[in-house]
A protein has these predicted regions:
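Structured, non-membrane catalytic/scaffold regions adjacent to prosthetic-group chemistry
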Residues: 2-231
Length: 232
């Protein structure tokens, strides 16, 4: 019988059996049951074209506060979008502003920069923990449903600087950020048409100095898998 405690690590924090970090261990349904070895290789899933589409962070094995970039978790709701060359990337600000604004990558980087260290966790991280804790469900897979948690240093331009350049008004209540990744979520109703991933921010949050348009992570320009060219 499984017990809640085994030494210093509670059962619900134990990792899945360590079978290495080779994506070939994913079964035919695409589920990944491995955990990285102590060399801290990330747990990854690949798409049909051999591109990494998901990473889980080995939180219990890390040293220090900053998660290395290649171990920083990723979650994909849609397919990974095509790479946008730097000279073709644009940021458009429109709606309830005095002056609609379009910036290319070089123009965005002319704004004063700011670096922010922050902890990020997916809202779905360990979603089934409490069912297990109340003996109402099986032990969650650490690599499937948890360890979607990382810390990084992000460098970019405060969103407030760009919004102020466009000129917000009394009617500017929310910011709707629309990304470049397009698709249909697995949980969407039948007949849902593809759409671009988007998120909303109250204007107070958008104007916070730590809300930035990041173009670098951990001292290097953003990688495509982590949101390049720019990540909000």
């Amino acid at each position: 019988m499984t017990t809640r405690q085994d030494g210093a690590i509670p059962d619900f924090l134990k990792m899945d059996d360590a079978i290495g970090s080779d994506p070939a261990n994913a079964n035919k349904t695409g589920n990944w049951h491995g955990w990285p070895t102590k060399d801290l290789n990330p747990v990854t899933l690949m798409d049909d074209e051999g591109r990494t589409v998901r990473i889980r962070t080995p939180v219990m094995d890390l040293e220090g506060l900053i998660t290395p970039t290649d171990l920083h978790y990723t979650v994909q709701h849609f397919a990974v979008p095509p790479v946008v060359p730097t000279d073709q990337w644009e940021l458009k600000i429109h709606g309830q502003v005095k002056n609609e604004l379009t910036l290319n990558f070089a123009q965005l980087r002319r704004f004063p920069g700011r670096s922010v260290r922050t902890v990020m966790e997916c809202s779905g991280s360990d979603a089934t923990f409490f069912e297990y804790f109340k003996d109402e469900g099986p032990k969650p897979s650490r690599t499937q449903e948890c360890m979607i948690l990382s810390t990084g240093e992000w460098t970019g331009v405060p969103l407030a600087a760009v919004l102020n350049a466009a000129g917000i008004t009394d009617k500017s209540l929310y910011v709707r950020a629309v990304g470049n990744d397009e698709g249909v979520p697995a949980t969407a109703a039948e007949g849902t048409k593809p759409f671009y991933y988007d998120k909303g921010l109250p204007i107070q949050k958008a104007l916070h100095p730590d809300t930035i348009l990041a173009y670098a992570q951990n001292g290097a320009l953003l990688e495509h898998l982590h949101g390049a060219r720019v990540r909000l």
